[in-house]
């Protein structure tokens, strides 16, 4: 599966609504889109999520559940660079 970094930028004043929805309904991911890990920016206005899927169109399906609360950027990740001592 390909991995993606998802950058969610929360709309001003929407953080309480985001967490309320998340606690009530979960991530609401469609089948085939897998959450791996996430990190919040220090001020909490952006969330960086590592996800994987073989069908990047699923991001749009997922974002329909959240688009009223922010915007999303999806970045396809490449292979991890290898150091000279790695085989």
Label every PLM stretch briefly.
Residues 63:
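Short, flexible helix/strand-to-coil boundary loops that buttress conserved ligand/catalytic motifs
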Residues 27, 66-73:
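A common structural junction motif
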Residues 1-46, 54-58, 78-87:
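Short S/T/G/P-rich N-terminal loop/turn motif that feeds into the first structured element of a domain
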